[in-house]
């Protein structure tokens, strides 16, 4: 295979992974190959597919359902681990079992709590403020501490989540429902209202679109979409030079990041100044920090970061999980009926669910766990990174290795969850008399160890109140594909992205009764 063929193969595969500009001409090619041939550690790394010269396992990285393909490889080879070599000497270590993920990401968290560093993201896009992607260290700890202090136990979060769910119910009265757009709006409504006191009116709202654009950019970069992150010397390519188009893209996305971080925060500051700021996490924080000293200004800067990250995070995984809920209910009417019966038994059809019911309807708790288990929003999690060489089970894990926990595989382990792991069955989390059993819940859908998602409580709250509110008042029926035919479960292919979700399908949201309609129409008056 000659040089031109290798470059063609590289470009073909990278373009499938979402690369924006892959021209490697002239000096770009020289830089690339100088870096590729720089070599890496020659040691006994964990098992994996046989690598190619130069490209490593780049062509082995699947573009559809990688979580299933990695799981099959590990099971076929009786291994908890799978190692993929990348060009330039680095590699990806897939952890396919709970034992491997716990051993490394929890028990050895001092080694495996870093995130891979992206030149595109941090240096060129200027998004080092995203604390979920920061290196493990003092800055990350300060941000996480502030997040917990301001978000955990905040009355604003649950109040706005409940109101957003009830606004969704009123939109579902419309016969021309596009549930995916409505779930997008509901999630944005909940998070923007809770963080900034901003209530978006439609899915075309400025802040909703801003979050969508930036989340899309983050997904491309985090998915390894730019050669500059594999070949760092490419950062010196001028913008005007062939192959330098990634810098123009970085400039555009950098502007989105600046806007997302500053505009809504300054909007709340203006509202506070004129006395019109509604209750939100931002208004509560700013009201308590009106001094203008160095310590307060640093806290305000950190707060800008975590507020922006909160609404960016919700624009991704939470939407996908709500779409999975819709799909599961449409495909499993018997499960839907059992969940509705459990809600009816608790509420007697007299009111809508609220957070006083949270934890008091065991079937709904089981349903929530099953939604997160059946298809987690991030099937391969977010990459961790090793901060030094380590040895595990006799294998070298080199410093800088990308660590990918196969969350989907762990939550589909037949030894834990039963042989019917591909079925949607909330009862797997319940005893025969309807109480919680000892099967592990689906908390790992939110991550592992010190890098577990800080917004997981907010995510669970949003999923619970939204799904319970819909089930109390609507039947989800008649799922059909884009050709109008009954939806075939075997044809469903989740997106291969940082926040995975099912393809769109049409379905009907039908009011359960006249009494349910009255609850929907009066819901916001009761909030």
Swiss-Prot record:
Compartment(s): Membrane
Entry EC no(s): 1.-.-.-
Cofactors named for this entry: heme
Superkingdom assignment: Eukaryota
Main location: membrane
Binding site for heme: 453
Annotated keywords: Glycoprotein, Heme, Iron, Membrane, Metal-binding, Monooxygenase, Oxidoreductase, Transmembrane, Transmembrane helix
Keyword Calcium in record: no
Glycan attachment points: 77, 274, 297
Task of the protein: Cytochrome P450 monooxygenase; part of the gene cluster that mediates the biosynthesis of erinacines, cyathane-xylosides that show unique biological activities, including leishmanicidal activity, stimulating activity for nerve growth-factor synthesis, and agonistic activity toward the kappa opioid receptor.
Family note: Belongs to the cytochrome P450 family.
Protein name: Cytochrome P450 monooxyhenase eriA
Gene: eriA
